[in-house]
Amino acid sequence: MQYKINMYAIVVYDVNVSRQNQIREFLRKYLYHVQRSVFEGEISPSSLYYMKKILQSYIGETDSLIIYVLRDKSCLMDKIVLGEDKDLQIY
C-alpha cells in the first residue's frame, strides 16, 4: 500500500516586477494564490523539491522568496486575516 505524504507550504515573495508574472504563473501550478505575492497549499515532497529548483532559477540578486514548510495544514495554529478575506476554501 502506498501512502501519500503531503506537506503544507506558504510561499511569499518580493521580486522585480519583470519576474512577477513568471513566478506567479509557475506557483499557480502547485499552490493556491491567496494574496498578491503569497501562495499556500498542500504539496508533496517531490513537488516541493522541483518547485524550489525552478524558483531558484527565476530569482535575481535583489529578489526575495521565502518558503515556510509545515508538516501538514493541521500544524498551522491559526490564520488571522485583517481586511478582505480571500480564503479559497483550503482549510
UniProtKB/Swiss-Prot annotation:
It comes from Nanoarchaeum equitans (strain Kin4-M). HAMAP family: Cas2. SUPFAM superfamilies: TTP0101/SSO1404-like (SSF143430). Mg(2+) binds at residue 14. Homodimer, forms a heterotetramer with a Cas1 homodimer. Belongs to the CRISPR-associated endoribonuclease Cas2 protein family. Keywords: Antiviral defense, Endonuclease, Hydrolase, Magnesium, Metal-binding, Nuclease. This is CRISPR-associated endoribonuclease Cas2. Its EC number is 3.1.-.-. Its cofactor is Mg(2+). It comes from the Archaea.
